[in-house]
């Protein structure tokens, strides 16, 4: 997608060959790379390059910072799905893993509610709720992924629409949209837990402390899913738009990454014992040149 690449700041994009090299680097270390292309929200750069994919086709400047924006992909236009199919066909071929994250979070419906294309689509489908219009959008994208042998992963926001397919994996990040999560799990849906109140590592240690991470429990609406067969595990997130250097990145990760790694495999044990072991790990990491948060900043 040359137009979008030309608009990138400081050449911050990957060539296909670079993607392949990252995947191979991870494979040799026992890791899989799962791509995410968030949609219909968080598509500001996509719409800046291709304005016709939004509801009103207005020119949009490429954003220089993160945020939530009202201009999102238009589900009322057939060309939106034609573009997505071309995009996913190209990207799916690069990634061998059978999972593909399509986001679905933080998608304001402001423009959809004024858009004649969206209104026409809703009338044709017999929909009255704009969350269900997003549900329609999600189903269309999931169908494209299935043609490429991929299983969709979505943020838990998408559960605000009706009858989300339990073949999709839900990633729980926010209590704001947690009410539908238990019913999805009870229907057999699989969930990854990434609660922002503990497992978002772009938050400073003063907010999501090492102690808080170590004692995190996968609780939704007062119920623990620690022993549920539908709880796939934990994923810590680190959104990097405000991370300027590799050293800052490492400081945010360590030693919190040790904590989430331990509790993902075992129940939390004695925290003082964990802290002692974390200190030893930090000493080793520091000798390897890793910039870890010092102990006085852990909690």
Question: Which residues does each PLM region occupy?
Answer:
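Single conserved hydrophobic/aromatic residue that forms the stacking wall/gate
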Residues: 1-9
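Anion (oxyanion) recognition and catalysis
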Residues: 20-23, 27, 146, 185-186
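Phosphate/diphosphate-binding loops
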Residues: 23, 37, 80, 84
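Glycine-rich, aromatic-flanked loop segments that form ligand/cofactor-binding clefts
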Residues: 27-51, 58, 189-192
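Glycine-rich, histidine-containing beta strand-loop boundary motifs that form or position
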Residues: 35-39, 104, 156, 195
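Flexible, acidic glycine-rich loops studded with aromatic residues
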Residues: 151-168, 174-299
């Amino acid at each position: 997608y040359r137009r979008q690449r030309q608009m990138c700041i400081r050449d911050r994009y990957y060539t296909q060959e670079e993607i392949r090299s990252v995947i191979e680097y991870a494979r040799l270390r026992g890791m899989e790379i799962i791509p995410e292309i968030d949609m219909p929200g968080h598509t500001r750069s996509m719409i800046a390059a291709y304005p016709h994919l939004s509801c009103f086709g207005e020119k949009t400047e490429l954003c220089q910072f993160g945020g939530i924006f009202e201009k999102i992909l238009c589900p009322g236009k057939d060309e939106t799905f034609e573009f997505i199919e071309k995009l996913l066909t190209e990207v799916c071929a690069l990634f061998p893993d059978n999972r593909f994250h399509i986001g679905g979070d933080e998608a304001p419906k402001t423009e959809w509610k004024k858009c004649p294309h969206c209104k026409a689509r809703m009338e044709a489908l017999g929909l009255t709720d704009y969350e269900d219009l997003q549900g329609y959008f999600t189903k269309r994208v999931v169908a494209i992924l299935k043609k490429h042998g991929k299983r969709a992963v979505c943020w838990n926001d998408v559960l605000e629409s009706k009858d989300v397919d339990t073949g999709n994996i839900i990633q729980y990040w926010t209590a704001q949209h947690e009410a539908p999560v238990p019913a999805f799990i009870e229907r057999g849906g699989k969930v990854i837990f990434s609660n922002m109140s503990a497992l978002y590592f772009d938050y400073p240690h003063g907010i999501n402390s090492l102690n808080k991470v170590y004692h995190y429990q996968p609780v939704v609406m007062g119920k623990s899913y620690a022993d549920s067969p539908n709880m796939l595990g934990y994923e810590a997130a680190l959104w990097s738009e405000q991370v300027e250097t590799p050293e800052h990145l490492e400081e945010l990760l360590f030693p919190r990454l040790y904590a989430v790694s331990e509790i993902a495999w075992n129940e939390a044990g004695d925290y003082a014992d964990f802290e002692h072991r974390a200190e030893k790990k930090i000493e080793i990491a520091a000798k390897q040149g890793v910039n870890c948060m010092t102990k006085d900043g852990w909690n």
